[in-house]
Amino acid sequence: MLNETPALAPDGQPYRLLTLRNNAGMVVTLMDWGATLLSARIPLSDGSVREALLGCASPECYQDQAAFLGASIGRYANRIANSRYTFDGETVTLSPSQGVNQLHGGPEGFDKRRWQIVNQNDRQVLFALSSDDGDQGFPGNLGATVQYRLTDDNRISITYRATVDKPCPVNMTNHVYFNLDGEQSDVRNHKLQILADEYLPVDEGGIPHDGLKSVAGTSFDFRSAKIIASEFLADDDQRKVKGYDHAFLLQAKGDGKKVAAHVWSADEKLQLKVYTTAPALQFYSGNFLGGTPSRGTEPYADWQGLALESEFLPDSPNHPEWPQPDCFLRPGEEYSSLTEYQFIAE
């Protein structure tokens, strides 16, 4: 189903809202602005329906937040240090968007664009976007698509694809936030498992500084499920950024059929499993969500949503030595990244 809103987006046109439904009764809502996930409502075994995603009260309210709620991120998700990288001996300077660094593709990233609806029905929608040579400092013309698909086993399947006519780092993701308790509550009470042996420490600006580190013996060891609060702010790597905001190099190594992460609501009525072909997941515990508009009368507070962003490791264009696929896309190649979020009602 496709609807247009009376409210106008920054380009002066209505927001276009799309609804996906499956045979299990799950309903997902999206909009074309930012190719954004707005809502995911899952029927529980007790007959109630639970909202699993953070979101705003109306499409236009998304212009009043800086948390990237549910948005498609590109060309390059996460941070690039000092907004520059070197490729084939040439230094490329990008548009900074967080201090001196570039975050999530620049000040006018893909989250702030209207994506075109290529096709859609009750089960899937395909969005497309063109990004010109020099956009946010990136070289080459880039064509991108994202397909959202809702399956009958309650998976939101997200496939990003891109092509370029000049070599360019490409790292697309969705910045959806989850609260499986279905309300404005503290996600640190969720139980979390991340199947990763290494994580990437960062400085206060979120920039990697010492390379990958084993999770063993640290508060970053989520290989066995644990309550997020159990070791929250337990070491300096967390305290630098007010909690968890770190990339984990996954054991799955790009195998999208293996579970990358598993989340349980505090009341254990809803679970989430994450599958991805991306090499890493960025676990963000919502450390700076405070003041973000919500669906209710009160804004979100810090730690009321968590993100599990599938991606290359942050600042990968400056670290070709890291054990993951090359983040540079070249002419004649296709970037493709698949992530699935599966909800399991108890």
Curated annotation (Swiss-Prot):
Active-site positions on this chain: 175, 309
Record gene name: galM
Keywords: Carbohydrate metabolism, Cytoplasm, Isomerase
Annotated pathway: Carbohydrate metabolism; hexose metabolism
Origin species: Escherichia coli (strain K12)
Disulfide bonds: none
Major location (coarse): cytoplasm
GO CC list: cytoplasm
Family: Belongs to the aldose epimerase family.
Function: Mutarotase converts alpha-aldose to the beta-anomer. It is active on D-glucose, L-arabinose, D-xylose, D-galactose, maltose and lactose.
Any GO BP: galactose catabolic process via UDP-galactose, Leloir pathway
Catalytic class of the enzyme: isomerase
One Gene Ontology molecular-function label: aldose 1-epimerase activity
Superkingdom of source: Bacteria
Compartmental location: Cytoplasm
Reaction(s) catalysed by this chain's protein: alpha-D-glucose = beta-D-glucose
Pfam families, per the entry: Aldose_epim (PF01263)
Name this protein carries in UniProt: Aldose 1-epimerase
Gene3D superfamilies: 2.70.98.10
Binding site residues for substrate: 79, 245
EC number of this enzyme: 5.1.3.3
Database matches in InterPro entries: Ald1_epimerase_CS, Ald_epimerase_bac, Aldose_1-epimerase, Aldose_1/G6P_1-epimerase, Gal_mutarotase_sf_dom, Galactose_mutarotase-like, GH-type_carb-bd
